[in-house]
Structures are given as C-alpha cells and as structure tokens.
C-alpha cells in the first residue's frame, strides 16, 4: 500500500537529486590505482555486500585465512570479531588434532618466558622510579644523563669483579707476593724503591693517599705490585681483553637501540604532532604522581618540536645575503673555537713537561704541599680548561643560529674534543718522558728500552697519573657543588634584587655533565691496565656522584628553559663513549706491543714486550693445541673467514636495502592515505554545499 510507503513522486524526486554513488566516489580516490585490503577476506574498496550471508561468509573467509597465521590472535592487526573467529578456529583445530606440536608449544613457552624476564628486569632495575621522576620534572635530556651514569656504574662494577677474580685473587692464591725491591747496584736498569720504610707523619700519609705514592705505590692498586708469575701474567693480560670486549658489546647494544630512535625522530614520518597527542599517553598509569610526570614528559617533547620548528621556519625565510652573513659568522666562531682549543692543549703539554723540572727543585722536594701541587699540575690544568671552556662553547653555539638539538651536538663535539684531546696530550707528554722522546738510542733509554733513570717503573707511573686524574675529578665535583652551587642557590633565594639576578638561576647543563662522565670513563679505560683497581674506585666515585647529583638536582637546579630530544642523547652519548673507548685502546695496545716492560716491577718483567708472554704460554701447551692456535693465524683460516664475513656483509646490506624499499613503500602508502582523506573531505564539502543549494 502506498500509505505505508513512499509516493512515486517522492521516489522520482529523490533519484533525481541523488549524486554519485559511494563506489564511484571511492573509485576516484588517489589510491584507486592500487587495490587495497584491510585484512584477509575483506572486500576491496567500493564493493558492497549483497546480503548478510555474504558478510558471514566474509568473516568465515577471514577466520579461515587467519588460521594459517602463526601469530597469536592478540598480535594480529584485525578487527575484534575476526580475532575471536581466529581464536575459535585455533581451539577447534587443536581439539581435532589432539594437541599442538611440541615445537610450537616450546616456541610459545619460550616467547612467554622471554617477555616475563624482560618485564622483570625492567622492574628490578635500580633507580627506575628516580629516573622516571627526573624525566618528568626536568626533561628527557636530564634523564638521559642519569641513565648513562647508571649504565657506566654497571659497567665499572662488572669490570671490578673481573679485575678482582683474574688479577687479585690469583696473586694471593699462588702465595704471598714478594715485598718491594731494594737497592740493586748490579742491575743495568738501576734500582726501584717504591716507598720509604719506617714511621711517617700524617701529612705524608695524606700526601701518599692523594698522589698514589708511598705505601700505595707497592700495593694491589698498581701494576708494579704483581709478581712475575706466568699464570698470573696470562690472566692479567686476558682480563684486559675480556673487559674491553664486554665494554664494546654493551656500548654497541646501547648505541644501536638509540640509533633507531634517532632515525625515527629525524625522519619526515613524525613531523606532525598528532602521534604525540594521540599515541604518547600511557593508559595504564595509576596515581596522580605518575599522571603528572607523564604529562610533563609529553610537554617537554612538544616544546622541543615547537622550538625546532620555529628555528627551521626562520632559516627557510632567510634571504641569500642573510645566509651568507650567518655562514661568515659561523666560520669566524669556529676559528675562535680552534684558537681556544690550541691554547688549552699547549697549556696542558707545558704543564706535563714542566712537572719533572719542578719536582727536582729543592723547595718542592722539601715541602710536601708544593710537591703535591706540582704532582697535580697536569690535572689542575686539565680541570681548569674543562671548567672554563664549555660555557664559552655554549655561548658560541647560541650565536650560530642552529636548532637546539644541533647546538647540543656542537657543544658535545667541541667539549669532547677538548676533554679527550687534553687526555691525549697528557699521554703524549708521558710517552715522551718514558721513551726519551721516541729515541730509543738515547743515553737514558739505550740500556733498557725506556727511561729507567727517571721512571724505573713506567707502568706504575702511568697508573698514578690516571689515579690522580680520577681522584682530582671527584674532588673538584665535590668542591664545586659544596662551595659554588649551594652558596649560589642560597644567594639567589635570599637576595631577590639585583644581586640575586646576578647570581642567576641554576640549570642542569646536560652536555657538560655528560662529557664529564665520558672523560672520567676514558681515563679509567686508559689506566685500568696500569692501575687494576681503578674500575673499583670509579664505581665508588660514580655511586657518590649519582647520589650527589640527584640531591643537588631536586634542591638546587630548576628545569631547563631549553630542552632537546631524548633520541639525540640516547644515540650521541654512546657514540661518544665509543670514541673514548677507541682513544683509550691506542695507548694500552701501544704499551702492550711496542714499549718494553719495566725490568724491576710487574708480572712481565724481563720480557721483550708484554705480548711476548702469550707466545711463550702457547709453546707450553700440547702440540695439538699449539697447531690449532697457530692455524688460526695462517691464511688457510683467515681467507675463508674473510670470504664468509664478506658474504654475510653482502647479505646484511641486501637485507637492509629490502627493508629500505619496504619502508619507502610504507611511507608512500601513508602519503596516499593522507591524500585520500583530503580528497574525501573535499568531496564531502562539495556534496553538502550542493545539497544545501538544491
């Protein structure tokens, strides 16, 4: 009956006003050239189901296809209805077959165990809540500093355990080590008397503690204490390589994980802010404290993105003359930076060379305080330049017109070059003293291969220099905190006027603090061969530093006015650590292979080189073991190994290229999705305006 339906006139008028169908609109999409599916069994865009039975058959096809998948239902990017069908089909299949295969069962159990172990490890990590609180209140950059400090503390703790197990314990298990050597007139390399016997005054004891001389010079702290036993020499040398490999693997793992975040942050995929607004929140947070911390973290991330966007927009709006002016200014500022670095390096070299001359003067030899100052003269110069120049570099970087992340990188590069190069200049000057300037035919080095008159145990001397650097760095940190930062904060709070503004607000300078950590760790890497217990000292130092920095952070510092990306810190900091590890390996390997060991101290005394102990140990092995070890050094082993490595490298490169093409395709699909949405929005506006006019 027409009373219950529509009149023919209304039906005809509706058909006249009807626009293009949904299928025709979808076929006009920019992505219509490529047929897209939303999952297995889902019909293409623009295809309509005929009836409900077709929809049921679609879900059935969905489930049948899903049954072929090996992933769990919760990991599949499908609708909830399809996941339920997938789960039911899997359960039905297991009931029909009796049970799943043993391999699939153990694979699933192993996956669950790995996930639970990972979650458990994250929950028992020390200071996890402290780092989260720091990140929420002071930003991701400050959190990355404390995360790096915790990471280095863990590495030093592992190295300390290895040093004790492979050096100190074998020394005492094979019998008590011999006492210090006495005067030996018949020795062609002179005599070595590490400390004076008898009672000494308290100031002298304090001086020995700070300089590493006296009773500490002949102790397990330094190289010269360990006796010349073949087994001990092997474990002593093997521990160095074992610790280096552990350091390298841990830093590489940390830097690779940070590289992924950096590439994602620097790419064009996350240029919009929608991913932070819609996907940055953690809906599993409980409690107001956690919620506020997460809000602050998101706020800092958005702040960094907005700051860098403003700088990029200003750079894009510059004219050619303005860009030329900026580049000229950058060139002049870089020349100034090079001049400052050159002056610092010359000062460090002069202080190291002049130390021996000052130590021979009667006034210095008779006054313990002057002798202590002269011994610490290179450390004082290094710490002075490291304290003065980083703020200058920060001011120069602010004048160059870079983004905040780029400024952080430049400050880090210049500061790390200053700190590590200053250490290199110190080592070069010490090498010049040990090897008579590289001239082994000189009068002082001809008999023993090193300057035995001035430095009878050169390994212990190197260990003492690194020990003083570590100790002086800790003392400087404590003094600056107690005598500069706390009084400055009190002055700023008590004097709100001009004097308070002059003192300024303290902000945690992440680049300076991070480079201080990397410099201290590089010193430990250089000195751990000559001072075996230096990692243990550095562990205690980092533990004190962590507690001190945490207290001062919440009581003295205020949140930084300008922050930087966490991805920059997570990748760049381990990269600088790798540079420090590479620099520290050079003097250690040079000492092992090229400089003759001291003839009067250490486990390698009497050898042509430290490495000569390894061939002698190999010759004491059975003939089969000798043949195998010598085979590892022949071309019959190295050439196939090189070929296999080349094949694996080519495979890795090809796999990376495939992944790169896949990523490019996914990026193109994302761009197509954006174009589809814009097109649909335009058509919707056009249709609504057409209906409104009609």
From Swiss-Prot:
Regions crossing the membrane: 151-171, 232-252, 331-351, 377-397, 408-428, 466-486, 514-534, 536-556, 575-595, 636-656
Any GO BP annotation: sensory perception of salty taste
Domain of life: Eukaryota
Glycosylation sites: 691
Function: Voltage-gated chloride channel involved in high-concentration salt taste sensation. Depolarization induced by high NaCl concentration may trigger the activation of TMC4-mediated chloride influx into taste bud cells, helping the return to resting potential. Also allows permeation of organic anions including gluconate, but their current amplitudes at positive potentials are less than that of chloride. Involved in pH and temperature-dependent modulation of salty taste.
Disruption phenotype: Knockout mice show impaired glossopharyngeal nerve response to high NaCl and KCl. Slight increased lick ratio value of KO mice for NaCl solutions compared to wild-type mice. No significant difference in Na, K, Cl, Ca, and Mg content in the sera and urine compared to wild-type. No apparent difference in morphology of taste cells and the expression of representative taste-related proteins compared to wild-type.
Extracellular face of the membrane: 1-150, 253-330, 398-407, 487-513, 557-574, 657-694
Catalytic activity field: chloride(in) = chloride(out)
Residue ranges that the UniProt entry lists as topological domain Cytoplasmic: 172-231, 352-376, 429-465, 535, 596-635
Membrane topology note: Multi-pass membrane protein
GO MF entries: voltage-gated chloride channel activity
Matches recorded under PANTHER family: TRANSMEMBRANE CHANNEL-LIKE PROTEIN 4 (PTHR23302:SF45), TRANSMEMBRANE CHANNEL-RELATED (PTHR23302)
Record-stated family: Belongs to the TMC family.
InterPro entries per record: TMC, TMC_dom
Gene: Tmc4
Protein name per the record: Voltage-gated chloride channel TMC4
Region feature (Disordered): 1-21
Keyword Transport (UniProt): yes
UniProt GO cellular component terms: plasma membrane
Key word Ion transport present: yes
């Amino acid at each position: 009956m027409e009373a219950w339906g529509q009149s023919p006139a209304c039906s005809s008028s509706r058909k006249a006003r009807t626009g293009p169908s949904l299928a025709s609109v979808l076929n006009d999409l920019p992505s219509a050239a490529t047929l897209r599916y939303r999952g297995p069994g889902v019909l293409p865009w623009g295809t309509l189901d005929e009836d409900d039975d077709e929809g049921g058959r679609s879900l059935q096809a969905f489930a049948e296809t899903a049954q072929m998948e090996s992933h769990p239902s919760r990991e599949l990017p499908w609708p909830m209805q399809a996941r339920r069908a997938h789960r039911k089909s899997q359960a039905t299949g297991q009931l029909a077959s009796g049970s799943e295969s043993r391999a699939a069962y153990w694979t699933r159990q192993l996956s669950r165990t790995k996930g639970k172990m990972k979650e458990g490890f994250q929950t028992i990590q020390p200071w996890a809540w402290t780092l989260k609180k720091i990140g929420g209140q002071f930003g991701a950059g400050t959190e990355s500093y404390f995360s790096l400090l915790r990471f280095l503390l863990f590495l030093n703790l592992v190295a300390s355990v290895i040093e004790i197990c492979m050096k100190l314990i074998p020394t005492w298990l094979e019998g008590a080590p011999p006492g210090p050597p006495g005067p030996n007139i018949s020795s062609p390399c002179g005599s070595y008397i590490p400390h004076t016997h008898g009672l000494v005054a308290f100031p002298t004891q304090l001086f020995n503690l700070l300089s590493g001389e006296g009773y500490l010079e002949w102790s397990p702290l330094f190289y010269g204490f360990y006796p010349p036993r073949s087994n001990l020499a092997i474990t002593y040398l093997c521990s160095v390589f074992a610790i280096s490999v552990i350091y390298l693997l841990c830093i590489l793992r940390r830097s690779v994980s940070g590289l992924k975040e950096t590439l994602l942050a620097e790419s064009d995929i996350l240029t919009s802010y929608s991913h932070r607004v819609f996907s940055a929140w953690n809906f599993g947070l409980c409690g107001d404290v956690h919620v506020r911390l997460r809000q602050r973290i998101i706020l800092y991330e958005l702040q960094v993105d907005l700051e860098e966007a403003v700088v990029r927009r200003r750079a894009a709006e510059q004219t050619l003359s303005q860009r030329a002016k900026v580049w000229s200014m950058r060139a002049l500022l870089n020349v100034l930076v090079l001049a400052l670095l050159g002056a610092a390096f010359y000062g460090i070299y002069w202080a190291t060379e002049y130390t021996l001359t000052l130590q021979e003067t009667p006034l210095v030899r008779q006054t313990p305080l002057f002798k202590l100052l002269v011994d610490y003269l290179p450390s004082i110069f290094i710490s002075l330049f490291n304290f003065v120049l980083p703020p200058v570099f920060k001011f120069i970087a602010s004048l160059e017109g870079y983004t905040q992340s780029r400024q952080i990188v430049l400050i880090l590069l210049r500061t790390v070059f200053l700190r590590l190069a200053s250490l290199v200049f110190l080592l070069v000057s010490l090498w010049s003293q040990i090897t008579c300037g590289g001239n082994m035919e000189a009068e002082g080095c001809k008999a023993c291969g090193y300057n035995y008159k001035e430095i009878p145990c050169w390994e212990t001397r190197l260990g003492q220099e690194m020990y003083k650097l570590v100790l002086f760095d800790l003392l400087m940190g404590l003094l600056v905190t107690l005598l500069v930062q706390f009084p400055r904060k009190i002055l700023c709070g008590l004097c709100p006027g001009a004097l308070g503004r002059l003192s300024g607000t303290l902000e945690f300078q992440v680049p300076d603090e991070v480079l201080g950590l990397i410099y201290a760790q590089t010193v430990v890497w250089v000195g751990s061969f000559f001072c075996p217990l230096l990692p243990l000292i550095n562990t205690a130092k980092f533990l004190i530093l962590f507690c001190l920095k945490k207290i001062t952070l919440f009581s003295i510092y205020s949140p930084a006015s300008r922050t930087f990306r966490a991805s920059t810190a997570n990748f760049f900091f381990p990269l600088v650590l790798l540079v420090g590890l590479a620099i520290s390996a050079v003097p250690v390997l040079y000492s092992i292979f090229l400089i003759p060991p001291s003839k009067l101290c250490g486990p390698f005394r009497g050898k042509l080189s430290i490495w000569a102990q390894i061939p002698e140990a190999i010759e004491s092995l059975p003939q089969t073991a000798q043949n195998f070890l010598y085979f590892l050094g022949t071309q019959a082993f190295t050439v196939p190994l090189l070929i296999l490595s080349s094949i694996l490298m080519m495979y890795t490169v090809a796999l990376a290229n495939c992944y790169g093409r896949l990523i490019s395709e996914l990026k193109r699909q994302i761009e197509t999705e954006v174009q589809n949405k814009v097109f649909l929005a335009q058509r919707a506006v056009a249709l609504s305006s057409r209906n409104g006019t009609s």
